[in-house]
């Protein structure tokens, strides 16, 4: 019998650590020894469909894509496993920040402004279309046909950042603990 093979997006990703923690809830040895592979998020559903992998841990919209086209079923979200941990971080070196203070400030302010605008946006039609235009969302999901999934993804976008976009020290501690535990 072929061993189970699961995929995540990167060995140092939140998805890798959430997958390991979820498996460890069942059996630590299984979590330690199961075959994990790395795949870019847009290829997860295709790899599952072609039986290259047996399951995956990835963020939206790819997990919903698999479910909508009938290839997979979401059994847990990373937020179910590790709530409120920083998922995405844009980091620059201290040297770069010192050499480019205006660019660094402008970049930070642009991200914060975009996060706030997304949080309070009433209509996500334009955002949704932009995500489709850039092939981030590669499947049809409408607010009239796939009501629950559409609003689930919209809610993830809206709450991508809480009150502060700053990573918290607890997030770094958790990530370092995971690196020591699983790498």
Describe these PLM feature segments:
Residues 29-34, 98-104:
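Inter-helical turn/loop segments and adjacent helix faces that build the functional surface
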Residues 85-103:
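A bilobed periplasmic-binding-protein/Venus flytrap-type ligand-binding module shared by bacterial periplasmic
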Residues 101-183:
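Secondary-structure end/capping motifs
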Residues 9-14, 79-81, 94-97:
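Short coil/turn segments
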Residues 65-79:
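Ligand-binding "clamshell"
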Residues 2-68, 173:
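Bilobed "Venus flytrap"/periplasmic-binding protein-like clamshell domains
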């Amino acid at each position: 019998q072929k061993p189970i093979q699961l995929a995540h997006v990167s060995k140092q990703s939140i998805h890798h650590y959430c997958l390991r923690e979820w498996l460890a809830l069942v059996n630590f040895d299984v979590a330690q020894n199961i075959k994990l592979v790395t795949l870019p998020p847009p290829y997860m559903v295709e790899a599952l469909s072609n039986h290259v992998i047996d399951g995956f841990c990835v963020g939206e919209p790819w997990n919903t894509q698999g479910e909508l086209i009938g290839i997979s079923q979401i059994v847990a979200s990373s937020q179910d496993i590790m709530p409120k941990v920083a998922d995405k971080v844009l980091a620059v070196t201290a040297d770069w920040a010192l050499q480019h203070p205006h660019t660094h400030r402008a970049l930070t302010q642009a991200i914060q402004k975009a996060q706030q605008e997304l949080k309070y946006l009433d209509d996500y039609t334009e955002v949704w279309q932009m995500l489709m235009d850039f092939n981030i969302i590669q499947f049809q999901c409408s607010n009239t046909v796939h009501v629950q999934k559409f609003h689930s993804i919209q809610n993830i976008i809206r709450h991508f950042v809480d009150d502060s976009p700053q990573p918290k020290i607890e997030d770094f501690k958790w990530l370092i603990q995971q690196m020591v535990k699983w790498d």
